[in-house]
């Protein structure tokens, strides 16, 4: 699970207000993730979230302000958890090694937590709506991901393993666009071979980057 509930009460001691607040928010975010996976955006209401998480609609409204506020929080929590996980695996690496590790990590995360990937795509799709109030969250996450990839490519260029004629920013766009496209096809095609698609993408992308 990308994030867990704060610790339970121990030794009969009551949780602090901050712990209760964090626990309530996490329970409601997890409820929203479950609802988005089962009934979609229309069915993921503050009332439904309150009922599923064991809280009231009033508390959900207090925490998130609105349905859009809830979706912003869901995206932030999923994005932050993924970024933390990826950074731990990268451990400061750069260049071709970092690109390969990141592609493998994306695949492992998708296979382990398909429900979280599905929620991200549901909300990213909804963010295209001109009236969407959480479009900036989706755009910010994607920009951060592209900037990370561009930094790995520049690191590889600095140590001579990546071609100097490669544009880091444009290559990062191709990288992230490729992974989004692969995952999107997987979401809508039950027979789509995700590991094979990732393997091909990894081989081709690294070949395109590698200095000869």
Give the ranges of each region predicted by the language model.
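N-terminal intrinsically disordered/low-complexity leader segments
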Residues: 1-23
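Helix-turn-helix
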Residues: 27, 31, 35-69, 73
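Short coil/turn segments at alpha/beta junctions that flank glycine-rich nucleotide-binding fingerprints
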Residues: 38-42, 113, 159
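Hydrophobic alpha-helical connector segments
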Residues: 73, 87-116, 168-175, 198
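Amphipathic alpha-helical packing segments from all-alpha helical-bundle domains
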Residues: 80-83, 87-88, 112, 132-159, ...
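Amphipathic alpha-helical segments used for helix-helix packing
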Residues: 98, 111-136
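Hydrophobic/aromatic-rich alpha-helical bundle segments in the mid-to-C-terminal region
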Residues: 117, 135-143, 157-205
């Amino acid at each position: 699970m990308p994030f867990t509930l704060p610790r339970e009460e121990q030794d009969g001691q009551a949780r602090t207000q901050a712990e209760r607040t964090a626990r309530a928010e996490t329970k409601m975010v997890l409820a929203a993730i479950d609802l988005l996976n089962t009934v979609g955006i229309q069915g993921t209401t503050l009332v439904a979230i309150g009922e599923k998480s064991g809280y009231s609609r009033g508390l959900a409204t207090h925490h998130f302000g609105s349905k859009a506020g809830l979706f912003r929080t869901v995206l932030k929590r999923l994005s932050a958890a993924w970024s933390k996980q990826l950074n731990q695996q990268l451990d400061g690496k750069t260049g071709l090694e970092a690109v390969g590790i990141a592609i493998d990590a994306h695949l492992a995360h998708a296979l382990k937590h398909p429900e979280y990937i599905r929620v991200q795509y549901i909300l990213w799709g909804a963010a295209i709506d001109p009236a969407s109030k959480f479009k900036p969250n989706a755009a910010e996450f994607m920009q951060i991901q592209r900037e990370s990839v561009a930094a790995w490519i520049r690191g590889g260029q600095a140590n001579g393993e990546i071609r100097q004629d490669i544009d880091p920013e444009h290559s990062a766009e191709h990288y992230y666009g490729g992974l989004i496209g692969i995952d999107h096809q997987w979401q809508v095609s039950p027979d789509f071979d995700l590991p094979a698609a990732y393997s091909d993408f990894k081989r081709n992308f690294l070949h395109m980057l590698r200095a000869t």
